Amino acid sequence: MWGRGLLLTDMNREFPPPRAAYAEAIVKPRLVLPPNAPGMPIGLFGGTFDPPHAAHRAACLLAMRRLGLDRVWWLVTPGNPLKDTKGLAPLASRVVAARKLAHHPRIDVTDLEAQLGTRYTYETVKYLVRRCPQVRFVWIMGADNLRSFHRWQRWRGITKLVPIAVVDRLGPSLYASAGVAGQALAYARVPETAAKTLPERTPPAWIYLHGLKSPLSSTALRAARALQR
């Protein structure tokens, strides 16, 4: 009888959740976000922006026009987990440079990831979707990123959180869609003629936007900058 009582007590006790559950339960700080409103289609454009260049701006303007986006948020990341961060310019200076280059009333340059303490795109997007559930977010990436998208942390999870717009780049467009992620997500590809519907679609959904053929690359610009030192 006594033993049963102990057993029932143990069964009813609220044991601590597993470690993974703790991670899910972390409450992020109440950050001040760029302008947004329920129903507003907003693009999310992440990168190190070291340095920012004209193709970044052109890609956002193309996506804004073709997808009917009200705003685009540039998420300047502290560092790319897939790239060597040695020699990376300080975050503050990259944010300043990005704001100077963007120079558009509907492009908001932020360091949200640094404020949130998130390292991966999945974590950042998940926070924003939960924080602003009625905003129609769209993730914007260059075609070169689609080629390596399968290497991103929880990349399939990202596709289930928001629609994705892939913007053409000179060169990568020839093979990006044939990569691992492009093939895996072929069933969810939206015709380019239906671009305006992308923000309203339930993910997974993605589109390839042709029209931008810029050879500019932050990696190449960094290499050129290093040679000049």
Where are these regions (language model features)?
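Nucleotidyltransferase catalytic core that binds NTPs
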Residues: W2-R229
